[in-house]
Amino acid sequence: MSAPVEVVLSADSAGQLFNCAVYDPHTGSEFLSYRGGNTSSRSLTILNGEYILGAQLGKNYINVWEIQRKDQLQQKIVCPGIVTCLCASPDGLYVLAGIAEAIYLWEVSTGNLLAILSRHFQDLSCIKFTDDSSHFVSGGKDNLAFIWNLSSVVQLDSSRTPEPRHILSRHSLPITDIHCGLMGPQARVATASLDQTVKVWEISSGEMLLSVLFDVGIMSVTFDPCEYFLFCGGSDGNIFQVSLCSTSLSRDKTFQSDSEGNQVFKGHRNLVTCLSVSMDGTVLLSGSNDETVRMWDVQSKQCIWTINHRGPVTNAAIIPAPANMFLSDSHPAVPLPRFSRHLNPSEQGDGTGTGGMSLRLGANTQEPEGTYLEKAEELYSLMCAVTDKSVFGDGENTKVRVSELEEEVRTLKKINKDLYEFSTQLLTKPN
């Protein structure tokens, strides 16, 4: 049997049978399960198609599994506090976590903590990257959502405080969910709130494009890939489908079921915590506190299949099937380093850095450090001077110094070659 194009990934708060599991989106049959702990809401993410990360419910660490080694919990990433939301960038270079009212940004290649963003006034509830990893959006219990430009966050030196690109402040109660559409910095983002509204914004301008008012608080939200419809999960168990192509659509709208695409999916008996649409837009996945995950046909609004969990569903999504998921003999290309709990320790010189290659962009340094190749050429010139002019004196001391320099040149050339090969693999790796 060929590997599926998409799979369903879900988790519940009980964790009695497994932490999270992978299912066939067509039949609902289980493919794989990952054991150890239980994952909190909005805190299950795939890192670079090679790892599954899940924040432990009520604890200050993140569980990590290699994606093809389902029966063994690989490691635990200890965090400065309880993680309330978690997201890995689609390009696999960064990990974001909401801890209390702060956003923590880690660099995956080194494990360095690059930034702590403390603009929210209350705990974070959700955080999402755009599809091109250029921006991320955070939402919290303070009724605020912030749009952040990733490059501006990682470029800033420690003497400057990163600022969000836009502040979205139209909600009057806590934000419960965020969904970013396609098109990177030109995308639209939807925010759901307990104030019974879902609002659609433009990332580039921060302008509100649409506000839809419902009769109940909204716990989850998503678009279909073409953004024909907006799907909103209510606290009463209903899922509301809002047509974004309706001729009667206005900026401020009250939801009413009609014949123009505004419809209701009925079946859940408790609040809907998760929503996700397949890449072709034909099926909708939902997870609920009624301990079920359901797959719906978008056109007919009928439930195709149901998966029963042992506790309230905290995470459920339709995701592209990672290439390594069904290959038992495959391994991650790069080991996952230990994540630091302090801001960029390699720069602070506390000796806790991993020594890996840093991908931090545009660091503000007065005297940029030379490349390994430049260092090697400089050492080679120095060796020639030693040989020709006996800079370090005559006899045995000169020979020892020359040997040391030759060894250092060989080491630097090897490091430069390894860096080049790693960068080439990273840039040519298919998405």
Curated annotation (Swiss-Prot):
Record has Cytoplasm as a keyword: yes
Function statement: Involved in left-right determination through controlling the correct clustering and migration of dorsal forerunner cells (DFCs) and Kupffer's vesicle formation. Component of the PELP1 complex involved in the nucleolar steps of 28S rRNA maturation and the subsequent nucleoplasmic transit of the pre-60S ribosomal subunit.
Assembly behavior: Component of the PELP1 complex, composed of at least PELP1, TEX10 and WDR18. The complex interacts with pre-60S ribosome particles.
SUPFAM superfamilies in UniProt: Quinoprotein alcohol dehydrogenase-like (SSF50998)
Mapped WD repeat ranges: 78-118, 119-158, 170-211, 213-252, 267-306
Annotated region (Disordered), positions in chain: 342-363
This protein's encoding gene: wdr18
Organism taxonomic ancestry: Eukaryota, Metazoa, Chordata, Craniata, Vertebrata
Cellular location(s): Nucleus, Nucleolus; Nucleus, Nucleoplasm; Dynein axonemal particle
Residue runs in coiled coils: none
One annotated GO biological process: DNA-templated DNA replication
Subcellular location, principal: nucleus
Pfam families: WD40 (PF00400), WD40_alt (PF14077)
Source species of the chain: Danio rerio (Zebrafish)
Keywords assigned: Cytoplasm, Developmental protein, Nucleus, Repeat, WD repeat
Free-text disruption phenotype from the record: Affects the left-right asymmetry of internal organs, but not their specification.
GO cellular component: dynein axonemal particle; nuclear pre-replicative complex; nucleolus; rixosome complex
UniProt-recorded name of the protein: WD repeat-containing protein 18
Keyword Nucleus: yes
Family membership noted in the UniProt record: Belongs to the WD repeat IPI3/WDR18 family.
